[in-house]
A protein has these predicted regions:
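Residue-level marker of regulatory loop/turn positions in helix-turn-helix DNA-binding domains and
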Residues: 4, 94, 224, 228
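Structural preference for beta-strand elements that scaffold enzyme active sites
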Residues: 10-14, 47-50, 91-93, 111-112, ...
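N-terminal structural segment of carbohydrate-active enzymes
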Residues: 3-14, 29-44
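Structured loop/turn residues at beta-strand edges in well-structured enzyme cores
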Residues: 6, 44, 108, 169, ...
Length: 266
């Protein structure tokens, strides 16, 4: 399946092949659970299945966050990618900051690299991008200094895109994620949310990943992660109205239904 990432209302369903996801919905190495979740996504019309084998929950908030090796990560994600690719015609993204994991995932059928590191973790990721033609999700993940949050995010993203272009990477392959929850305080996340508009990012495809993030829990007074469904959907709809077009969601099936109904009413 060839997915146009400039299309409106693209929904990415989260499939955590982990046991320590902050949202508590990881399937671990259970292929049956993974396929059941993926089938639900596909049947509901969810556009992308995002498979990740390493928890990205912030160490500053959650205890017991341990980095996993490439081998550990591969042992989790590859069997699941194989199973999804064998059973469903759906776009798959690999959620990894490691180039060797991303490369192997691509060999097994992943279409998109979803890297939260902003190319700061693995220097070989650029080399992988040079020898493949897969889309790459560039996530802002850099400490915010003084000044407007949105301005620094845009500047940091633009610098990284310019560097990628100098390396021969076609900008048409790039999807931008403004990086809610990564290297940002609660106040900075809220400011970014309030001031977000896709025009500031030169009309690149924009992926939003606010789903169940801790800053939404703070502003809605929902410390329980399972109680953040409504605020997560409200956040995504607000950012949709500001030009975002790809939405990484834990409750992807519900969100797909909601935006489909909205389309019927317009």
């Amino acid at each position: 399946m060839k997915l146009n990432l400039f299309s409106k209302n693209i929904v990415m369903g989260i499939l955590n092949a982990t046991d320590d996801s902050f949202s508590g919905d990881g399937v671990g190495n259970n292929i049956d659970k993974a396929l059941q979740l993926a089938k639900g996504f596909v049947d509901a019309g969810v556009d992308i299945v995002d498979v990740g084998g390493e928890s990205t929950r912030p160490k500053s908030i959650y205890e017991g966050v341990n980095e996993v090796t490439s081998d550990e990560e591969l042992s989790k994600v590859i069997p699941i990618i194989d199973a999804i690719r064998s059973n469903f015609d759906v776009t798959i993204s690999i959620d990894s900051r490691k180039s060797d994991v991303a490369e192997e995932a691509i060999k097994h059928g992943a279409n998109i690299i979803n890297d939260i590191s902003m190319l700061s973790y693995d220097e070989n990721m650029i080399d992988l991008l040079k020898k493949t033609d897969n889309h790459y999700i560039l996530t802002h993940n850099k400490k915010i200094n003084t000044g407007k949050v949105i301005d620094q995010v845009v500047n940091d993203i633009n610098k990284t895109i310019n560097n990628l272009e100098k390396e021969g990477i076609d900008r048409k392959r790039i999807v931008i994620d403004p990086g809610f929850g990564f290297n940002k305080s609660i106040e900075q996340n809220i400011e970014l949310h309030n001031n977000f508009t896709s025009e500031k990012f030169n009309n690149f495809p924009i992926l939003i990943g606010t789903s169940k993030k801790s800053f939404l829990g703070e502003i809605s007074n929902n410390k329980d992660i399972d109680s953040r469904t409504e605020i997560s959907i409200a956040s995504a709809l607000d950012l949709k109205n500001k030009g975002a077009n790809i939405f990484r969601m834990h409750d992807a099936i519900l969100f797909k239904k909601i935006i489909s109904y909205l389309d019927l009413l317009q």
